[in-house]
Amino acid sequence: MVEIVVVKLIYRIMENNMNDTELAGVNENLPRRQIVLDKLNEWGIPFTMYEHPPLPTIEMALEYWKDVEATHCKNLFFRNHKGNKHYLVVFECHQQMAIHDIEKMLHQGKLSFASEQRMDKYLGLKPGSVSPFGLINDTNKEVKLFLDKNLKDAPLLSFHPNDNRASLVVKNEDFMRYLELWGGEWEFLELY
């Protein structure tokens, strides 16, 4: 409870220096973040949360992550050619993956990045805040998660809590427990 209050107080302080568009983004994302925090607390999954300015890209985030000990992840949301299947692909943030290489690895046919509308529909997220925590919103378990197998060996993992103004660090074993409790389809794959 204290952590939640602190988050709200920090945002009230930040609001004094923001324009209306920035304020709308903060107010819109706080409930998304709160859903994640509530679910992790409900499931007994410990985490450390780091707050920072909005970081919609990896390049911007690296400056703020430099002192955060964790494997920071890149999260890409795809759809198949027909648009009837959706995939979240997660790998270490410093790796580069071409979409054609990902298509070959996943064996799911031709892929394209999912639209903002699909991202909202299936993950309840906006661009720049995609993470496996968005799977909490996939109540019908329609998104398949692919994790690079190298993440198996990372002691700590870092993801946005459905809000790119913060990063959550969780122990690998706690993240695996999160995936089990989520209950959707996921697998490790050698992506690079």
Stretches with model-predicted labels:
Residues 9-192:
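Extended, low-hydrophobicity, polar/charged segments
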Residues 2-7:
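Acidic, Ala/Val/Gly-enriched low-complexity intrinsically disordered segments
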